[in-house]
Each structure stands twice: as structure tokens, then as C-alpha cells.
UniProtKB/Swiss-Prot annotation:
Disulfide bond residue pairs: C41-C63, C45-C65, C56-C76
GO cellular component term of the entry, any: extracellular region
Subcellular location: Secreted
GO terms assigned for molecular function: C-X-C chemokine binding
Tagged with keyword Signal: yes
Protein name per UniProt: Evasin P1127
Assigned keywords, A-Z: Disulfide bond, Glycoprotein, Secreted, Signal
Signal peptide range in chain numbering: 1-28
The organism of origin for this protein: Ixodes ricinus
Reported function: Salivary chemokine-binding protein which binds to host chemokines CXCL1, CXCL2, CXCL3, CXCL5 and CXCL8.
Glycan attachment sites: N44, N89
């Protein structure tokens, strides 16, 4: 009897986990107004003997050292997050109004 109860609860847990995963994936897939990117800065970082990490000097200070726990080497990465919903909804007329115009100079 205990084995059947345990098996039933285990199956119910896997079904609930599957539903939760499906909901999370479909919710994240609909986030077209957010953008997250990670770029490699072309260098690595290492942990020094005093515990500090070597600096990542690329891209005007945008690069940071990311490493796994317990590892003495890492990667210099630049991360960017943009939430496009902060900018509102631009219409075609807004974009046209913000576009640069050619100056008309008369020559004599």
C-alpha cells in the first residue's frame, strides 16, 4: 500500500513540475520587450594569491570577471539588459519626427 501511495505522489509531483516548467517557459517566451545579451571581452581573469581577481580592462570598463565557485580562472564578460517597455510605444510618425533631416542650403 505504501509503495502505491509513494508512486502516486511521485507521479503527481512530476506532473506538477512539468506544468510549472511549461508555464515558466511560455511566460518567458512572450517577453519580446526585454533583451539580455552577454559578450566575451576577449580576455580571461585569474585569481591572485591574495584572493583578488585580475581586472578586466576591455570595453571602457563594461567587462566584469565571471567565474565558477572553487575555480581560479574565469571569463571577462560584458552584460547588457534592456527593458524596451520603459520607452513606450513609438509610432511611425514618432520615428519620422526623430529622424535627422538634411539641411537645405542655398548657394549663390
Amino acid at each position: 500500500m505504501e509503495a502505491k501511495t509513494f508512486a502516486f505522489l511521485e507521479i503527481a509531483m512530476f506532473i506538477a513540475l512539468g506544468i510549472q516548467t511549461f508555464v515558466a517557459v511560455t511566460d518567458a517566451a512572450g517577453k519580446d520587450d526585454e533583451h539580455f545579451s552577454v559578450d566575451y571581452c576577449g580576455m580571461n581573469c585569474t585569481q591572485q594569491e591574495d584572493g583578488s581577481w585580475t581586472a578586466c580592462s576591455g570595453r571602457n570598463g563594461e567587462c566584469r570577471c565571471y567565474h565558477e565557485s572553487g575555480k581560479r580562472s574565469g571569463l571577462c564578460l560584458s552584460t547588457t539588459y534592456i527593458d524596451f517597455s520603459e520607452y513606450g510605444n513609438l509610432s511611425d510618425s514618432d520615428i519620422a519626427a526623430a529622424s535627422p533631416r538634411l539641411s537645405m542650403k542655398e548657394s549663390h
